[in-house]
Regions:
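Substrate-binding beta-hairpin/strand module that engages nucleic acids
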Residues: 118-120, 324-342
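C-terminal structured "cap/appendage" subdomains that terminate the fold
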Residues: 355-374
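Structural alpha/beta core scaffold segments of enzyme domains
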Residues: 1-291, 324, 346, 350, ...
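Generic long, charged, amphipathic alpha-helical segments
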Residues: 334-360
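Glycine-rich, small/acidic residue-mixed loop/short-helix segments
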Residues: 308
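Short beta-alpha connecting loops at secondary-structure transitions
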Residues: 187-192, 256, 293-302, 359-362
Length: 397
């Protein structure tokens, strides 16, 4: 079925018909759990006409509302103690753990109740990043410049979480994006960077495909399309310089580059990878450049970028949520693995100097990582990665 048009610029259909060359591709990303170190949990105390809740939440208002609804009291009779969470990343905006704790506490008024989910409870009952499927078509003119971009997005759940096409940072004169959202009985919710991790993988990966089809260096190709995005261009130039783009690499190594703006901040990353004959991907180095306005706390910026890249490496190389016979297959870190310390590459963090107001840095470094790795794999092997997580079998020599 036709999707809802979310971006319509120029005349993409006419430009595609007139293009000297067209390229098509399909991308898919799975449901994604947040993999919290601290499982979902909450404590509640129900007394005569009032409720008190202790929750490592990202939002006190939804906690207050669901506690009031569950206990049958006015919202003003709910007191929330917001605790520091052991990981959240969007999952703790959905306080279903609070509902359970309050429901139990309501049965034994005056007795505090603490409900802690098991790891399996947390992973198999997540509010997942939606599964998304993407059909793309790009048109190039005779000089290899992009003239048309068509992107059909399909996904499960809230259309707000699927993407809109506004995530595309590169200047293409004719763009058409539509979104088809299917409501299915799988709970979905925001995941660190919301739409940008999957949209970044798709839009930068496909831009890299256009560069290859045009026979152009991907850095130079992308650079030429960022004239109206000077902050992101500054990140792209800085990361290319710091990574030594174009310089010789060890035998079997290759680099990929990606850039994306999100939440008022800007980030570009270069990943250096190699692929073994068995198809195993090793990321040797990641170089990141961010534009986040005035730097207030340099070590905090570095830590946030490193953490974002660590999380992005996990969903790029390691895990996704699988449904079988109506149930989630994965349940713990044995079948939903995270990047381990011994697998983590060195990460270099560079900041574009700025005297503008500070902007966020916790989420923007997440999206460029997956396309940077996938683009590097293409440079190393000639094989395109259009699905995550990356499976070794797809790259076996």
């Amino acid at each position: 079925p036709a999707g809802r048009v979310t971006r319509d610029q120029g005349d993409a259909a006419a430009a595609m018909r007139a293009a000297a060359r067209t390229i098509r591709a399909e991308y898919m990303l799975p449901f994604m759990d947040h993999a919290l170190m601290e499982p979902m949990n909450a404590a509640a105390l129900v007394t005569d006409g009032a409720v008190e809740v202790w929750s490592p939440t990202q939002g006190s208002t939804p906690v207050q509302e669901i506690a009031a609804q569950t206990a049958g009291v006015p919202v003003g009779k709910v007191k929330v103690h917001a605790l520091m969470p052991g990981g959240a990343f969007g999952r703790r905006f959905t306080p279903d753990d609070v509902a359970i704790a309050v429901a139990v506490a309501r049965q034994i008024p005056g007795t505090p109740v603490h409900v802690v989910w098991t790891r399996e409870d947390s992973i198999r009952n997540g509010a997942y990043r939606p599964l998304t499927y993407h059909q793309l078509e790009g048109g190039l003119d005779a000089a290899g410049n992009p003239v048309a971009w068509v992107h059909h997005i399909s996904g499960a759940g809230n259309p707000f979480l699927l993407g809109s096409g506004q995530e595309l940072p590169y200047a293409v004169p004719n763009i058409l994006v539509d979104v088809y959202a299917k409501d299915i009985p799988v709970p979905t919710g925001p995941w660190r960077s919301v739409t940008y991790p999957h949209m970044g993988f798709v839009v930068d990966g496909f831009t890299d495909e256009l560069a290859a089809a045009a026979g152009k260096d991907p850095y130079q190709f992308k650079r030429a399309l960022l004239g109206k995005s000077p902050k992101l261009l500054a990140c792209l130039d800085l990361v290319a310089q710091k990574a030594g783009w174009g310089k010789p690499l060890p035998q079997g190594h290759a680099v990929g580059i990606a850039a994306l703006s999100s939440f008022g901040s800007h980030a570009a990353e270069v990943a250096e990878v190699s692929v073994s004959p068995a198809g195993e991907v090793k990321v040797h180095r990641v170089v990141a450049a961010v534009h986040v306005g005035t730097v207030v706390n340099p070590p905090m910026i570095e830590a946030q970028v490193e953490g974002a890249i660590t999380m992005a490496l996990s969903f790029t190389l390691k895990h996704g949520i699988t449904l079988r016979d109506g149930a989630v297959v994965e349940g713990n870190f044995d079948d939903y693995p995270l990047i381990r310390m011994g697998e983590m590459p060195p990460v270099e963090v560079h900041v574009v100097p700025s005297d503008e107001a500070p902007t966020g840095v916790g989420e923007p470094p997440v999206p460029p990582l997956a396309p940077a790795v996938a683009n590097a794999i293409f440079a190393a092997t000639g094989k395109r990665i259009r699905r995550l997580p990356i499976e070794a079998g797809a790259l076996r020599a």
